[in-house]
Amino acid sequence: MIDGLEEVPLQPAEGELPDAVRDWLEAAAKVSSDFYGEGLGRRYYRYVPSDPVVVYRAIESLVVRRELRGRRFCELGCGFGIAAGLAELLGFQACGIEWEEDLCRRSRELRDRQGLAFKVFHESYLPEGYEVVQGMGGKDLVVPGGPAAEQPMFEFLDPADIDLFFVYPWPDEEEFMAQLFRHLGDEAAVLLMYQGEGEISAWRGRE
């Protein structure tokens, strides 16, 4: 249960993955292996990849069940852009936002080698003026102008255009990411949140 959001049911399919998806995941696994083999997991200790098959099946379910208004996808904190690539393979116009320059570079190199076209923005997913503070139970979002603030804009992206946001937050950031989604997304947008150990859920703002 996430305050202010309504859960969207998921019915993940089973069976074989499409060849293009398997190829993408194999290439992504190689990048991830090299990354940790270089000892960079200690440098970027907050980067932990989600289970890509679980993510793929969840996005696929939202498409099959017609839960989405359109096919525009944004991965917040995209790391290697694995989810953005999966979304593109499912027919989305996809992008990712990542603050760490090295992760952006690796995601773009992976994308280009595999012939995909999703965009990777080397930016913060916090709009200008928004801040994160440590609250009693985790991180909280500070919104300029308070709850009645207008929907934010990025210089590089209009979040109101996004139909599906994806994020894998740390446990103490789940409520913060839900707060951010309530400001970024419009009433038709869906937030897909990976919650670790194969758990994933989808949410939409209450009407």
Model-assigned labels for residue ranges:
Residues M1-R69, R108-P159:
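S-adenosyl-L-methionine
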Residues F80-F92:
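Conserved SAM-binding loop of SAM-dependent methyltransferases across substrates and taxa
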Residues Q93-E98:
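Conserved SAM-binding motif I beta-strand of class I
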Residues E100, L110, E197:
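Residues in the short beta-alpha loop(s) of Rossmann-like NAD(P)-binding domains
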Residues C104-R105:
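Short alpha-helix immediately C-terminal to the canonical SAM-binding loop
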Residues L164, P171-E207:
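C-terminal substrate-binding/active-site "lid" region of AdoMet-derived donor-dependent transferases
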